[in-house]
Amino acid sequence: VNVYSPALSKGTVTNAYGFYSLTLPPGEHTIVAQFIGYQKSEQQIKLQGDMTLNFKLAASSTELEEVEVSSTRADENVSSVEMSVARLDVKDVKKMPQLLGEVDIIRSLTLLPGISTVGEGSNGFNVRGGNTDQNLILLDEAPVYNSSHLFGFFSIFNADAVKDVKLYKGGIPAQYGGRLSSVVDVRQKEGNNQRFAATGGIGLLSSRLMLEGPIKKERASFMVAGRRSYADLFLGLLEDPDLNQNILFFYDLNTKINWRINERNSLFLSGYFGRDVFGINDFFSFDWGNATTSLRWNHVFNPKTFANFSLIFSDYTYSLG
């Protein structure tokens, strides 16, 4: 988000968490906050010392009669200093054709340049010739060791619970480590702190439900989302005893709590738990799943210094019988 003073032609840009620092001379100023796709917000202030100024932007849409597209020289067409970075809009992902109608975040990445799928019915992907195990996948900063359900047919990410997805194909920042090919940084929704809302869907293989709302308006909010497949229910309806005793299903749960304690401190607690269960009569069984928890504390020391403290837990378990 761009935050600036029009009169002084001086401004700054917020970071990923919405924090910014802007130094202005004492006096009366008009401060503007602006971002593409949102309504511009202006506030009048009388600056006498250090102060905190928060903005809340509302989404906007504009109907255009005509759009003219023109290009610029390659050396002038620089919109970001981040190279080899792609961002996915979850709204666009939901519009893409998907296998059996199930929205899949990971498979949608294979539509981007430099990324290829490892094959149909598989959830892995290759980035610029690298192997699938060279991709670091994060969910609210917690590493995910197995990002698929049903042996790779679907990803573990419930699109209703995802806020945004960022993919680093090269020039990976130093804060990420442990992989050679790419980093997929998935962030969950923080919950609506104004009103309660629900989103859900019924698909061919699974159903899902997401609830969000304020715990305390303007201060704390929550988001909880669940999903379960029901292939095992259909198998039980078959008359063949070799099939109706088989088990094949998955389920997952996403949660997040956001609490703005005061102007200087914010807490975020998020979690994920998912499980796959597969069994062939009494002959063979295979269960696996992920569990992650992230606790982040954002603290502003002064107008120019802030810090993020994170406590991360990630676990992958499986059993073979």
Please report, for each region that a protein language model flagged, where it lies by residue.
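Periplasm-facing N-terminal accessory domains of Gram-negative outer-membrane beta-barrel systems
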Residues: V1-E66, T72
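Membrane-embedded beta-strand positions in outer-membrane beta-barrel channels/transporters
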Residues: N54, E66, I106, G124, ...
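Transmembrane beta-barrel architecture of outer-membrane proteins
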Residues: D104, T110, S122, G152, ...
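Short strand-turn segments of transmembrane beta-barrel domains in outer membranes
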Residues: G152-S155, K163-P173, S182-G213, S221-R228, ...
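Periplasmic N-terminal accessory/gating domains of Gram-negative outer-membrane beta-barrel systems
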Residues: Q39, M51, S70-P173, V183, ...
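Structural signature of outer-membrane beta-barrel domains
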Residues: A74, T132, A142-V144, K189, ...
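Outer-membrane beta-barrel and related beta-rich outer-membrane complex signature
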Residues: G236-L238, F268, D276-F283, S319-G321
